[in-house]
Amino acid sequence: MSRVTLSRYLIEQTRSNNTPADLRFLIEVVARACKAISHQVSKGALGGVLGSAGSENVQGEVQKKLDVLSNEILLEANEWGGHLAGMASEEMDNAYQIPGKYPKGAYLLVFDPLDGSSNIDVNVSVGTIFSVLRCPDACFSQNDALGEEAFLQPGTKQVAAGYAIYGPQTMLVLTLGHGVMGFTLDRELGSFVLTHENLCVPQSTAEFAINMSNQRHWEAPVQRYVGELLAGKEGPLGKNYNMRWIASMVADVHRILTRGGIFMYPRDAREPDKAGKLRLMYEANPMSMIIEQAGGAATTGTQRILEIQPQSLHQRVPVFLGSKEEVERVTGYHQG
């Protein structure tokens, strides 16, 4: 039986689920950009792209050279195709305007070009996260600049979401709202090939991912829940749990997606003015769509992430996502 490439899968989705052709083309362009980023990441020190770029992004985080390069790759790949009304990135303060010499399209692309880049110098898996929204008709113009308000849509409005993970293999994990598919990059063919069909998160688990060094700064419901996990078989949950933490959201969530578990990044008492660490629009929303499409759950502890009405492009939220049973338990502790 012939292998199913990403292009073939997307064409079949156009036939069976009425996926618009321009969305199909957009996903293919994003995938090509991810292949280019994968190539740069794999060069490591040989490519001269490791280390700091000597600048900070809008969050005040030091930008790595590969952050900047990955951002440029995604912008240049997507700006000219006529599928997008605008783009937004973790690495840019404001929305990216499609140059006037190119036509505009119906969609908005929001992305974290290189998630986990603080790990790049030590050769740990990193990735690209992206979200696709429709541009509201009221915000669309071929001639005028696109405002931030066009992007401020709840995650339920996403028409596609995905991530690429650059590890021992390069994988693209994608949802168009009809389940979650995993594609592995065949470097000989130069194509992403369908290798993981209809990914599902196990409902019950014995793994969790959280940065335990921050434990003293967590809110009481998180302290309670993690305490119960650590209590093991003798504790109230009646089983032993393993903790894993890579400090790369793509890598941590990919493990949760394939093996089950719960990923947690709660709010932190050291920064009471910030609701959390992870960004809603281009980290929490796309990952939540993927996890929910795979049968899991994703909340802030008090609210379903996909139902949050964004207030700003770089808004932060606490995140609890993964196996439904565990997410519902910790969410219940917050609400009780």
UniProtKB/Swiss-Prot annotation:
It catalyses: beta-D-fructose 1,6-bisphosphate + H2O = beta-D-fructose 6-phosphate + phosphate. Pathway: Carbohydrate biosynthesis; gluconeogenesis. It comes from the Bacteria. It is found in: Cytoplasm. Its EC number is 3.1.3.11. InterPro entries: FBPase_C_dom, FBPase_class-1, FBPase_N, FBPtase. It holds the Pfam family FBPase_C. Its main location: cytoplasm. Binds 2 magnesium ions per subunit. Homotetramer. PANTHER family: FRUCTOSE-1,6-BISPHOSPHATASE-RELATED, SEDOHEPTULOSE-1,7-BISPHOSPHATASE, CHLOROPLASTIC. Belongs to the FBPase class 1 family. This is Fructose-1,6-bisphosphatase class 1. It comes from Stutzerimonas stutzeri (strain A1501) (Pseudomonas stutzeri). The gene is fbp.
